[in-house]
């Protein structure tokens, strides 16, 4: 589309280019002719397949409130390049092991002698051979020589650039004689195997480039630079990235509006013919802030009357502190867009789905008053029905279930995604948890199947399932690869769908073959040069042997062995169980009897890590992987961990801790933990559940988490129906349901849980020494009451009716 500017940065690691739609040209745009890329079934897609999930919803969602209006400083002027485009044109990879070394140097004229605070992204900067002094760079009046050298070389760096504040008078138009220095012997593209922290070639390239960059930053003038780097080549202005609209929002400096600047801004909230009026102010732009009332995702839609060239910048954030500080989720996420107006009426619906709660609309380059008619969100999610529900005597638990369900919905498009704002990506480990949550909350079996298929297809190119798909980041997280295997088991257990199991069975086998090749012959443990990750805790994790990977591997072997007869290959089960026993024996041999725990890792020289965490013990409890003599300590580490054990940081890992507590027969403790872990979110008015537990991720930050909407944290959707309602599938296909509610935490509870046969509902209430339980279930489901420690003291009165 010609109006879409092409020379723009990416939104984030996994998202497409920044949306900048220039509609200011009065003439009809000239479209380029289409070019044949490949025959319909001959491209990298191999073949066309029928859609296997529903189209996304489109629902108008209005803002709840107009929050504020401000005058803000005009936009920063940026000088930036996209390193991939310069070094590897056409490449779309974002691997951390990619090496993107280059230098940019240019002359720029300053209108006066001044100190300037330069905004930077991904680069170190020198001006006339000097760095910053007290955070500011000194510019002479007239010509100045500027050098940019990348801080990091890896492929996650989408932009190398700087921004000049508007009051400095330094502009991109004043830049001249720009040169680029490439380092072809150091530049490389490489999949993340080995991962950058374990990649000797990547580390060597970094070591070789660092002194070159440091030397370049000390060069005071162009002539010295060209002498040092004779391979420098002119860089055309067209190779520079367009103005970075998001940078100007991040660095906004707000001032109060004055009378007459903005009239009737609340009119924008309503879809009628009334208009807010925003008038131009000399030397300032006007910013309007709106509140959706809760986090949401979709496409911005707006209508306004404006002069040609008026710029509309739209940016959204998830959270702002009580003192007004804005949290920009990142790093490197441009959760914004730009629209440049034509003369007269402008109506636009954004092409990219974006998320947030607080939305900032900044009008720039106004030459005449703007009449702003409407602004809304076209909500776009997977079209789910809330078949699951939960209500009990504790209002906080009801709200926790509600925001968990909303979070999951916002992280569902044509796949499960990690979050609606930062990446919008199918992370395979996240998807395993989200699949369980979605089956027990929405009955979204089609999306579960789709995610299993998509992730499994990565085995065409990799020995184990990739950590995220589809992707330009070829990275394996072994724990995620094993969790993909669990997803296959989870789906079969929930639905009894043997046909789908047989479809993906070759993928299950190949994933385990890749894992078997990673077993270290010396230790007998899983060892891989990958991103070895499970939780965001700050443990000793940069090594090939992380012990939690061996626990996950052992469980993947067990689940596959159970599935083998269903898939028609029962003879495979014994071999996998033997591998599992070998892994468990190897794990227990490295138990630290002094610290009564497993070391977190084994270093490349054979040294045992000095770190110990709760994670290995809770996985050993969950997966039945501890020798008898270690089980008491494993239980203690899981239930009452000592202070020296690294704790769980993310609600993602909490899911596995909760599951371990259930395995240990402590369902009440899980309900207590849900209240303890999620209440801090409620206390600050969260409308979705967070990526991290408050304050554990970064105790020194004003912001309690990175992502404020992360569906890997929606574990209450799984455990509240299972424990508080007591709805427990007893076998594959939910043909039989056990009813065993934990009743000593609440006075009453009710709700529903979907199954492949329809919804199962439970309503229970204590009346003196009687416990009344009403169950509704489809006729084909067998229902059985299972007493537990909390029900023994009651006379149970159970009734059942059809759904």
Region roles according to the model:
Residues 1-418, 430, 446-447, 451, ...:
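Extracellular/oxidizing-compartment recognition motifs
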Residues 630-639:
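Alpha-helical repeat scaffolds
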Residues 1, 323, 369-372, 376-403, ...:
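Active-site acid/base region of carbohydrate-active enzymes
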Residues 299-316, 359-364, 424, 428-458, ...:
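Alpha-helical support elements that line or immediately flank enzyme active sites
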Residues 603-609, 639-647, 676-682:
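Solenoid-like repeat scaffolds
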Residues 120, 141, 297, 354-356, ...:
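Short, solvent-exposed loop/turn segments at the edges of secondary structure
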Residues 2-20, 668-803:
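Non-catalytic C-terminal accessory modules of carbohydrate-active enzymes
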């Amino acid at each position: 589309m010609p109006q879409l500017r092409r020379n723009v940065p990416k939104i984030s690691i996994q998202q497409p280019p920044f949306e900048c739609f220039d509609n200011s040209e009065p003439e009809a745009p000239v479209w380029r002719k289409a070019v044949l890329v490949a025959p319909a079934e001959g491209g990298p897609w191999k073949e066309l397949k029928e859609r296997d999930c529903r189209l996304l919803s489109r629902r108008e969602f209005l803002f709840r409130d107009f929050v504020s209006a401000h005058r803000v400083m005009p936009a920063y002027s940026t000088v930036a390049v996209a390193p991939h485009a310069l070094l590897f044109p056409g490449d779309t990879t974002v691997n951390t092991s990619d090496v993107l070394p280059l230098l940019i140097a240019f002359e720029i004229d300053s209108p006066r002698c001044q100190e300037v605070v330069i905004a930077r992204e991904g680069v170190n900067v020198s001006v006339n051979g000097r760095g910053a002094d007290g955070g500011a760079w000194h510019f002479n009046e007239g010509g100045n020589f500027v050098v940019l050298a990348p801080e990091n070389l890896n492929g996650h760096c989408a932009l190398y650039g700087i921004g000049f504040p508007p009051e400095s008078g330094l502009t991109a138009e004043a830049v001249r004689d720009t040169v680029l220095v490439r380092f072809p012997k150091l530049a490389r593209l490489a999949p993340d195997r080995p991962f950058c922290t374990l990649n000797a070639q990547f580390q060597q390239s970094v070591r070789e480039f660092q002194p070159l960059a440091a030397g370049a930053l000390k060069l005071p003038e162009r002539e010295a630079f060209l002498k040092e780097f004779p391979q420098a080549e002119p860089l055309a202005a067209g190779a520079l990235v367009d103005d970075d609209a998001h940078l100007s929002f991040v660095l906004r400096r707000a001032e109060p509006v004055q009378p007459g600047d903005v009239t009737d801004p609340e009119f924008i909230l309503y879809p009628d013919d009334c208009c807010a009026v925003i008038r131009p102010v000399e030397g300032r732009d006007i910013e309007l802030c709106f509140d959706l009332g809760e986090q949401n995702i979709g496409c911005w839609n707006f209508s306004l009357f404006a002069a040609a060239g008026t710029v509309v910048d739209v940016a959204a954030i998830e959270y702002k502190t009580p003192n007004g500080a804005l949290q920009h989720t990142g790093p490197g996420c441009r959760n914004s867009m730009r629209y440049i107006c034509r003369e007269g009426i402008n109506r636009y619906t954004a092409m990219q789905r974006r998320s947030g709660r607080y939305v900032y609309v900044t009008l720039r380059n106004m030459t005449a008053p703007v009449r702003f008619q409407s602004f809304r969100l076209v909500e776009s999610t997977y079209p789910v029905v809330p078949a699951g529900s939960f209500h009990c005597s504790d209002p906080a638990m009801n709200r926790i279930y509600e925001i968990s369900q909303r979070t999951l919905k916002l992280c569902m498009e044509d796949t499960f995604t990690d979050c609606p704002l930062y990446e919008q990506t199918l992370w395979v480990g996240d998807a395993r948890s989200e699949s369980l949550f979605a089956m027990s909350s929405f009955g979204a079996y089609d999306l579960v199947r789709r995610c299993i298929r998509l992730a499994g297809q990565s085995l065409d190119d990799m020995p184990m399932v990739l950590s995220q798909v589809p992707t330009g980041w070829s990275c394996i997280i072994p724990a995620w690869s094993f969790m993909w295997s669990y997803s296959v088991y989870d789906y079969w257990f929930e639905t009894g769908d043997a046909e789908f199991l047989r479809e993906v069975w070759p993928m299950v086998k190949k994933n385990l073959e890749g894992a078997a090749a990673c077993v270290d012959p010396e230790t007998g443990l899983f060892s891989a040069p990958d991103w070895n990750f499970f939780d965001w805790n700050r443990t000793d994790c940069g090594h090939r042997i992380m012990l939690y990977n061996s626990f996950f591997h052992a469980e993947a072997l067990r689940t596959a062995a159970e599935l083998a007869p269903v898939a028609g290959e029962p003879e495979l089960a014994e071999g996998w169980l033997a591998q599992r026993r070998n892994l468990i024996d190897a794990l227990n041999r490295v138990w630290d009897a002094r610290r009564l725990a497993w070391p977190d890792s084994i270093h490349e020289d054979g040294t045992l890590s000095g770190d110990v965490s709760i994670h290995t013990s809770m996985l050993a409890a969950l997966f039945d992987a501890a020798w008898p003599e270690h089980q008491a300590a494993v239980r203690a580490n899981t239930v009452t961990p000592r202070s020296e054990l690294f704790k769980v940081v993310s609600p993602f890992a909490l899911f596995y801790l909760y599951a371990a507590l259930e395995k240990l027969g402590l369902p009440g403790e899980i309900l207590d933990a849900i209240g303890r872990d999620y209440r801090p979110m409620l206390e600050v008015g969260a409308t979705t559940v967070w990526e991290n537990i408050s304050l554990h991720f970064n105790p020194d930050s004003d912001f309690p988490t990175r992502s404020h909407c992360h569906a890997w944290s929606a574990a209450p959707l799984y455990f509240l129906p299972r424990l508080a309602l007591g709805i427990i599938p007893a076998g594959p296909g939910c043909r039989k349901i056990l009813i065993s509610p934990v009743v000593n935490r609440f006075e009453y509870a009710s709700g529903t849980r979907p199954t492949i046969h329809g919804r199962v509902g439970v309503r229970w209430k204590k009346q003196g020494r009687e416990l009344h339980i009403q169950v509704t279930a489809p006729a084909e489901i067998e229902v059985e009451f299972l007493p537990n420690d909390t029900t023994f003291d009651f006379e149970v009165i159970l009734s059942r009716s059809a759904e």
